[in-house]
């Protein structure tokens, strides 16, 4: 069976496996205080074009989101995101578990617009009883979004300016950041993104690493005791160099972006294969997540030979399904998908 189920169902890049093997006998200090982690941090600072950026390595995406949000916000503050935001839908109430309300607003193509944000904040501040409410303290967005959409240069700059107007911190979830930045729909680079938010993270788990995310405080100083809070949230790895080595490898010779381009190329071909067989594309995603509309009959037949996820049962006759590519996706797998679909054309 071929699989397009997710971008983290393989082990890790061969280059990372090799680097871990080569350094296996080394003895270094723990918790990220090692030369590999320092090298990785320096490479990331160079990549974001900010020598003062503060970089921290955490174990996974949910831990990263909860740690950053809980560390930046006061106890009475909440975080704003769209209704389809990852922290609202797919993180098991983790943010709320640490005492911060997720304030949801409607999105446009799964993106938060400045108009929606401004309207909410104006309405909130106009309410004389707002001191008795959860105070908005942060805006959370994903790049790319849950539906694979990409914020444009203009949208991101405007959103950050709006956040600054209302004294809100902008936090960008970059679990799939590489795929967003190299997509044809993206008209900016990593330094631009870093300059137009307060804090973001560079995803490793979904972009070639065995595990790990790199948090970058680029528009603000890291909160006091952030490192301690990372441990409090269970996101600090004692063998910290395991994360440092991975990001040091990913940011050597632009490997992070090279593998992201490969995934985008594979996703583009998947889309063309579905279109060739007359299958409707559900969302116009330019990234490594592709969404198609299948009939129940085709879904049942295809799922016997291909692994993928149901995204939404839209109706009795339509099932939206997600197909995801990664560094590990092979042309031969796409050939096989094409061949399988021919039988049902």
Spans of features found by a protein language model:
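Catalytic PLP-binding core of fold-type I/II PLP enzymes
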Residues: 151-183
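Conserved PLP-anchoring active-site segment centered on the Schiff-base-forming lysine
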Residues: 71-89, 118
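Conserved N-terminal alpha-helix of the aminotransferase class I/II PLP-enzyme fold
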Residues: 13-61, 83-88, 94
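General beta-strand structural signal in soluble alpha/beta enzymes
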Residues: 3-6, 55-59, 81-82, 141, ...
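PLP-dependent aminotransferase-class I/II
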Residues: 99-137, 141-144, 151-158
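Active-site C-terminal subdomain of aminotransferase-like
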Residues: 135, 142, 150, 187-286
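Conserved C-terminal alpha-helix-loop-beta "cap" of PLP-dependent enzymes
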Residues: 75-76, 268-269, 273-343
């Amino acid at each position: 069976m071929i699989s397009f189920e997710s971008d983290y169902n393989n082990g890790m890049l061969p280059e990372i496996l090799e680097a871990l093997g080569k350094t296996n006998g080394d003895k270094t200090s723990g918790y990220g205080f090692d030369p590999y982690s320092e090298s990785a941090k320096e490479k990331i600072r160079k990549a974001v074009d900010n020598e003062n950026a503060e970089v921290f390595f955490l174990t996974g995406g949910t831990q990263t989101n909860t740690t950053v949000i809980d560390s930046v916000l006061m106890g009475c503050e909440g975080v704003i995101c769209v209704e389809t935001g990852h922290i609202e839908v797919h993180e098991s109430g983790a943010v709320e578990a640490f005492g911060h309300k997720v304030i949801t607003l409607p999105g446009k193509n799964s993106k938060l617009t400045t108009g929606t944000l401004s309207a909410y904040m104006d309405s909130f501040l106009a309410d004389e009883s707002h001191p008795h409410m959860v105070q908005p303290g942060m805006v959370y967005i994903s790049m790319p979004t849950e539906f694979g959409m990409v914020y444009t240069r203009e949208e991101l700059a405007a959103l950050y300016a709006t956040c600054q107007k209302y004294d809100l911190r902008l936090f960008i979830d970059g679990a799939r950041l590489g795929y967003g930045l190299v997509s044809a729909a993206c008209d900016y680079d990593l330094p631009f993104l870093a300059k137009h938010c307060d804090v973001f993270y560079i995803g490793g788990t979904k972009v070639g690493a065995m595990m790990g995310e790199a948090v970058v405080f680029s528009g603000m100083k890291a909160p006091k005791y952030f490192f301690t809070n990372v441990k409090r949230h269970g996101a600090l790895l004692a063998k910290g160099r395991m994360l440092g080595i991975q990001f040091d490898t990913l940011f050597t010779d632009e490997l992070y972006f090279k593998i992201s381009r490969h995934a985008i190329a594979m996703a583009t071909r998947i889309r063309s294969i579905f279109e060739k067989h007359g299958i409707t594309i559900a969302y116009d995603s330019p990234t490594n997540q592709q969404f198609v509309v299948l009939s129940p009959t085709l879904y049942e037949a295809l799922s016997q030979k291909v692994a993928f996820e149901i995204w939404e049962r839209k109706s009795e006759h339509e099932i939206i399904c997600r197909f995801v590519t990664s560094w590990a996706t092979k042309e031969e797998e796409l050939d096989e998908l094409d061949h399988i679909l021919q039988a049902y054309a």
